[in-house]
Amino acid sequence: MQISDTGHSHMPDFHAVLAREDWQNQTITHLNRLPAHPAFASWRDELAARDNHLSTRRRQLDGEWQFVYARSPFAVDAQWLTQDLPDSRGTPVPSNWQMEGYDAPIYTNVRYPIDTTPPRVPEDNPTGCYSLHFTVEDTWRENGQTQIIFDGVNSAFHLWCNGVWVGYSQDSRLPAAFDLSPFLRPGDNRLCVMVMRWSAGSWLEDQDMWRMSGIFRSVWLLNKPQQRLCDVQLTPALDALYRDGTLQVQATVEATEAALAGLSVGVSLWRGEEQVAAGRQPLGTPAVDERGHYAERVDFALAVTAPAHWSAETPNCYRAVVTLWRGDELLEAEAWDIGFRRIEIADGLLRLNGKPLLIRGVNRHEHHYLRGQVVTEADMVQDILLMKQNNFNAVRCSHYPNAPRWYELCNRYGLYVVDEANIETHGMVPMNRLSDDPAWLPAFSARVTRMVQSNRNHPCIIIWSLGNESGGGGNHEALYHWLKRNDPSRPVQYEGGGADTTATDIICPMYARVERDQPIPAVPKWGIKKWISLPGEQRPLILCEYAHAMGNSLGNFADYWQAFREYPRLQGGFIWDWADQAIRKIFDDGSVGWAYGGDFGDKPNDRQFCMNGLVFPDRTPHPSLVEAKHAQQYFQFTLLSTSPLRVRITSEYLFRPTDNEVVRWQVQSAGETLYHGNLTLALPPEGSDEITLLDSLILPEGARAVWLTLEVTQPRATDWSEADHRVAWQQFPLPAPLALPAPTVPAGAPDLIVSDEVWQIRAGSQCWTIDRRTGLLSRWSVGGQEQLLTPLRDQFIRAPLDNDIGVSEVERIDPNAWVERWKSAGLYDLEAHCVQCDAQRLANETLVDCRWHYLRGEEVVIVSHWRMHFTADGTLRLAVDGERAETLPPLPRVGLHFQVADQQAPVSWLGLGPHENYPDRRSSACFARWEQPLAAMTTPYIFPTENGLRCDTQALDWGRWHVSGHFHFSVQPWSTRQLMETDHWHKMQAEDGVWITLDGLHMGVGGDDSWTPSVLPQWLLSQTRWQYEFFLRCL
């Protein structure tokens, strides 16, 4: 590649640059931008490159820049090129200007935030003008090429240096480099960057995220020598036996034609300080056609005997140092971490190093609750550690290439990455309007090809993605074939275009169900088990998005993982998504809380649909993260027999033995430990072992609720976890003796005191009062102190979950959403009429028999019958049966609730825990005796909803209150009504007491998606009759 001397006397002036309106033209993806290439540092010492020392030729320009905000590019004063304007002020780079007090962030999912008129964008186009004064060393200015590199600018920008226009770039998510050499001068230099919020590129950036602007990634200066490496492609490969390796090297040099002949390129491969291979070759390739060869390029290979393989389990990295020489003079060194691995699709399976992968994946946006889309290395490491600790092995860069440092960290810690082009046109009608338009091919092409040219050297990237939700069209087809030709070492995936698209090597649907078909016109989504069995379909299936984790969600998740393990070609998927995309905000009333769409006056907006995370914005886990961790765990357990007590443990690690794992086990009866033990787990990859825990299981008389609990922990700390980290666990119920002790019935019955208004029942210090008109147990005093703040009442509703609410486009009502069906049925406004309230004192109890009709208008839709059995020891046995009209939809819950005074005591229970769990999301919960502070019994979902349930409980103790039976429960300082009527968690107000909710039945939460009713039939309360029973005491 020949260097040309670039003068700038012909450069256009400020107004001429703006008059072109380059940002309105989809065919202009850049002007004067340098070709894409891997990250460079331009070391001048080979060992410094090997050891990744800071390069003296690379300088970061992050820090405080001057900033001026304008309503459009044409509102900017041309004087800005030479001096700061009066209204300029300091702003950090990187940053989004919306997070610095300018303009408003906008959250939309599908809809474009501007009128859909591609390629044109509004004339009123918020514009940020950044300026910086800097100096460069004389040696930089006098020798070689000095580049400026912007790692990410949203959405397009013009660049000036010392008042002279340098160039233009769009594509918010890939580095843009320019040659500054012709524009630099001794001493002070002034850099000016004009960033437009909207550009023709915005039509390709309609991702489900906050729309923000500015220089949001780092800015660098890089000094390269006069003769320099301008591209290096490294392709490590393994042979057919996955034993020996080859490092394919293609390097391109930029130099004058005269200088090329004396140059050579060297490569050395290092593992730590050990050099494992090296080679050097003069520039020039063999002839490629009748016109000759590439004089500026070199292609050669290094043979590596039995290299350590790279995988997410064993991220063995080598350091490849590529050097440019003039004779024996080292001109420059560049270096990258590489890994030897072979990714391929064979026999219908995605394989790494010959082994079929099981993708334990999650989608991740770059988002920080204070900095917007600015993420630091510490943020990245925090995410990676949490992912690894929770059994994730893969991440999809949704839906754009990430900051360069992200890939380096994934290489080192071990995560498989799907790198995705910054292309989404979800808001177009039809969606493929641009992807099938040849006029947009240059824009599509730049985003895909530059992604590959920038990131291909990273071993963590195992799949390229052509983008997201852009329909199917000729542009995708063309780029699929370009990818297959230019990087045959990786498969390509693309979901757009539906079931029959040919632009993908992997079936990668989003939100396909395990069993149920979704016959959507043009793009049907079959049940995943059916999909892989369709005639002629031989590709693996990996869900690019599934398990929509919005709020209280992730029901049915274990069903997916059962299918993945049963059907080899179902190779996992990527949960949507990692973190709630909320922003910390000081609201108008001075309160501080999490903000979502609409909270900044942004229109249009899709409200809370930006909060679909397994973790809160500050990375505090949701309970659903524990469910994901358990379903994805690398060990499977099978109970072989109970006496002797034998289990089989199978490792799903493909590449590493269990050299840091211990099995801890215990047998418990009603939460009390009977037997326990530890043993070292020594399994080869994919190995299993059958273990005898007890030669004979002998249970004491009266044993009940007997469970075997096994967990696998890692006694030693790892790169991503602390010592004693728990990686897997499982419980099995064990048979208990059939004979149970007969319940004791206290002699005598409580006194029954009758008046016209109430039944009053007394037993020692206990006194219960039932209102004869309403039938409600309205008072319960102990030693003269009243315990109830509200009566005990039936509870048939829950504060709607996001999954109950349905569609994200909040102005459109979906009559099929559960909340709309419940509203239409009048479930939230039922009137209770007591039609029976009888009392009698029997030999050993006093019985109050009450029946209520719940009316929708004049129609009886629910009948509830309570039998309250009061005994002399102060116990209330409450037996409830009921029925609903067949015209009602399935109910969200069947139970009761009441408010009591705060006990200032921890909550203890015998049941599933310790975390929140629901009938269709409880595989990760264990049956035991648990104790937690009251605050831990609430999950503060940002959009308040039903939360905090614990299922399959046999006993509950909180302060004076004791409940036994078989039930689900929650104990919280919030009423269902307040949860329903509040739209942000920080607005929740303290109430006088604490609400106890006891459910006989509770509907599942769903979560296959959040816009259709996704609760599976087995988790719906479809029955029209029910009964349950509790024992309550207040001591």
From Swiss-Prot:
Its cofactor is Mg(2+); Na(+). Na(+) binds at residues 208, 609, 612. Its EC number is 3.2.1.23. It catalyses: Hydrolysis of terminal non-reducing beta-D-galactose residues in beta-D-galactosides. The record marks 365, 399 as: Transition state stabilizer. Mg(2+) 2 binds at residue 605. Mg(2+) 1 binds at residues 424, 426, 469. Transmembrane segments: none annotated. InterPro entries: B-gal_small/dom_5, Bact_Beta-galactosidase, Beta-gal/glucu_dom_sf, Gal_mutarotase_sf_dom, Galactose-bd-like_sf, GH-type_carb-bd, Glyco_hydro_2, Glyco_hydro_2_AS. It is an enzyme of class 3 (hydrolase). Belongs to the glycosyl hydrolase 2 family. Homotetramer. This is Beta-galactosidase. It comes from Klebsiella pneumoniae (strain 342).
